A protein has these predicted regions:
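The feature encodes the CheY-like receiver
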Residues: 58, 86
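Acidic, metal-coordinating helix/loop segments flanking the phosphotransfer/catalytic sites
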Residues: 32-50
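Conserved active-site segment of CheY-like receiver
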Residues: 9, 81-85, 104-106
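Short amphipathic alpha-helix used as the core "switch/output" element in two-component signaling
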Residues: 63-74
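Acidic catalytic/metal-coordinating carboxylates
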Residues: 35, 61-64
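As written
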Residues: 93-99
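Active-site residues of response regulator receiver
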Residues: 54-55, 82
């Protein structure tokens, strides 16, 4: 089972992603967080394989949180999740240690494929 921690400042989106993850074989949502403080607290007791992290997390910077996560001992993989298309984001995300960037409008199967690849250590094709 791939253990996913969902981090987004919108409660409805968090709940929706948690529900969708419950329906997909091979995935389990081990927790959710609405901000960076909740993320770091949840990280320690959920031990996810991958964190699905909103790029624009309220006033917080998802890239900075990604760097913080990657500095943890035994860090989880990170997939940035965004509603905003930004041509420079892929490079910034990779530099911050994220596995990939997925648009919130992407097909759910593409999201699942990206999460699987992240855990296996593969890179998403550009």
């Amino acid at each position: 089972m791939i253990r996913v921690l969902v981090v987004d400042d919108h409660p409805v989106l968090r709940a929706g992603l948690e529900a969708v993850l419950r329906t997909e074989p091979g995935f389990v949502c081990v927790g959710t967080a609405g901000d960076g403080h909740e993320l770091l607290a949840a990280l320690r007791h959920t031990r996810p394989d991958v964190v699905l992290l909103d790029w624009r997390l309220g006033d917080e910077d998802g890239l900075a949180l990604c760097r913080t996560l990657r500095a943890e001992p035994a860090p989880p993989e990170v997939v940035l999740y965004t509603a905003t298309v930004d041509p420079g984001l892929d490079g910034q995300a990779e530099a911050a240690g994220a596995h990939a960037v997925v648009e919130k409008s992407a097909d759910i199967d593409d999201l699942f494929d990206t999460l699987r690849l992240a855990v296996r250590g593969g890179r998403q094709a550009a």
